């Protein structure tokens, strides 16, 4: 259990540290709800300073143990004109604030839970209409504690346990002159709660030497308790130091693990890309090998024919399948030739070789001729499309 802070500034620092902590000892609340949880606890401590925020291990009914926030302390309970302090523990479960907290009455060793009670079970679990009708996000801890105080004022959940009174000794007794009457066992110490409804006899007298003996016993008990508290504080300080050191080591190891995991992912991605690239290159190599074999076969087949092509006219190197294809080839060749001529004229004009008026006249003539060749090519292309459509229709009908 983490010790509670002692002042408002430490309360804020404690809550900020607890809600932002990472690792095995972190609290399991949703990130979107942590700010509202912090505000609820700050408002609660501001309204009821007797409550203190802590973190502790909570055991569920199924055996699961989780580290949760709690508000531990006392809440005021007015009863018959006197204000009593009821010790409670308010656990903020994992689903808080969307679901209500878990409230327990936490009786001390000299207290007992009233049985039966309308709102408190024998184990100390509190059940109130406010908890059953919890509405997110309007419900909060301040209103819950106010409702608890009012419900307990109507029906106190705790009674003080009666202590056994030792029998008085047989020697003559001397009464304390400062008291108006011999004090009883119930009057020797103030009770913070209503008396127990259960029976039990009490002594009506108290001897003087017993009174002094109790004072010496109380002093020894106080010394013993202070020594135990000092040892507990020392052990707790050592445990806190060890826990912080272990948490720092755990955070460092978690950071190292995250870095290694990130590098592993990068290596896996790189390896996958290399495997895919290797497969692609193997496919391309196979295609290139097939094309190389085809070219080698073509070269071997046509190697003897090159001797007959020495006196071949370049214009007759390509034979067209029909008249339209031959006309289309001529139009395209003339169009491209004129395009080259215009480009040469532009180059010559930029270099200052051709005068401006001659440049414009030649470009105008060439452009007009190019237009006619392109128009003829468009008509030939349309005629080829008609022939192809007719051929396809003939094959379909046949």
From Swiss-Prot:
Main location: other
GO biological process: cell division; protein modification process; protein transport; trichome branching
Post-translation changes: Ubiquitinated by SINAT1, SINAT2, SINAT3 and SINAT4 for subsequent proteasomal degradation.
Molecular function per GO: ubiquitin binding
Keyword NADP listed: no
Family assignment from sequence similarity: Belongs to the ubiquitin-conjugating enzyme family. UEV subfamily.
Domain called SB: residue spans: 322-390
UniProt domain UEV: residue ranges: 18-162
Localization per record: Early endosome; Late endosome; Prevacuolar compartment
Family matches, as InterPro entries: ESCRT-I_UEV_domain (IPR052070), ESCRT_assembly_dom (IPR037202), SB_dom (IPR017916), UBQ-conjugating_enzyme/RWD (IPR016135), UEV_N (IPR008883)
Tissue: Expressed in roots, stems, leaves and flowers.
Protein name stated in the entry: Protein ELC
CDD domains named in the record: UEV_TSG101-like (cd11685)
Coiled-coil intervals, chain numbering: 247-291
Manganese listed as a keyword: no
Ranges of biased composition (kind: Polar residues): 175-187
Gene: ELC
Quaternary context: Component of the endosomal sorting required for transport complex I (ESCRT-I), composed of ELC, VPS28 and VPS37. Interacts with VPS28 and VPS37. Binds ubiquitin in vitro. Interacts with FREE1. Interacts with TOL9/TOM1D. Interacts with BRO1/ALIX. Interacts with SINAT1, SINAT2, SINAT3 and SINAT4.
Region (Disordered): 157-202
């Amino acid at each position: 259990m983490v010790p509670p802070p002692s002042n408002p500034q430490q309360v804020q620092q404690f809550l900020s540290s607890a809600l932002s902590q990472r690792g095995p000892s972190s609290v399991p609340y949703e990130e979107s709800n942590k700010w509202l949880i912090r505000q609820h606890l700050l408002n609660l401590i501001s309204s009821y300073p007797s409550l203190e925020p802590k973190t502790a291990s909570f055991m569920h009914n199924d055996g699961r143990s989780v580290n949760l926030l709690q508000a531990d302390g006392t809440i005021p309970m007015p009863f018959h004109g006197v204000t009593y302090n009821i010790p409670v523990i308010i656990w903020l479960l994992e689903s808080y604030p969307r679901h209500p907290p878990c409230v327990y009455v936490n009786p001390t060793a000299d207290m007992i839970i009233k049985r039966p009670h309308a709102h408190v079970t024998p184990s100390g679990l509190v059940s109130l209409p406010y908890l059953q009708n919890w509405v997110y996000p309007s419900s909060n801890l301040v209103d819950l504690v106010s409702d608890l105080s009012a419900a307990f004022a109507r029906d106190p959940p705790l009674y003080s346990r009666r202590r056994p009174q030792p029998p008085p000794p047989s020697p003559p007794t001397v009464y304390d002159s400062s008291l108006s009457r011999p004090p009883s066992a119930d009057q020797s110490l103030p009770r913070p709660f209503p008396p127990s409804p259960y029976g039990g006899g009490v002594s009506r007298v108290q001897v003087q030497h017993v009174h002094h003996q109790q004072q010496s016993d109380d002093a020894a008990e106080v010394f013993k308790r202070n020594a135990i508290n000092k040892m507990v504080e020392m052990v707790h300080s050592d445990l806190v130091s060890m826990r912080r050191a272990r948490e720092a080591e755990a955070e460092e190891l978690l950071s190292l693990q995250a870095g290694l995991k990130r590098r592993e992912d990068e290596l896996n991605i790189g390896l996958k890309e290399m495997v895919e690239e290797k497969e692609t290159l193997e496919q391309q190599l196979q295609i290139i090998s097939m094309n190389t074999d085809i070219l080698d076969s073509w070269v071997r087949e046509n190697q003897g024919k090159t001797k007959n092509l020495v006196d071949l006219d370049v214009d007759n190197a390509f034979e067209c399948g029909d008249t339209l294809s031959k006309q289309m080839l001529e139009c395209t060749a003339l169009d491209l030739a004129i395009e080259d001529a215009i480009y040469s004229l532009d180059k010559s004009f930029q270099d200052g070789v051709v005068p401006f008026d001659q440049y414009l006249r030649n470009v105008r003539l060439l452009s007009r001729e190019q237009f006619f060749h392109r128009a003829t090519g468009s008509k030939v292309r349309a005629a080829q499309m008609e022939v192809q459509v007719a051929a396809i229709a003939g094959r379909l009908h046949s």
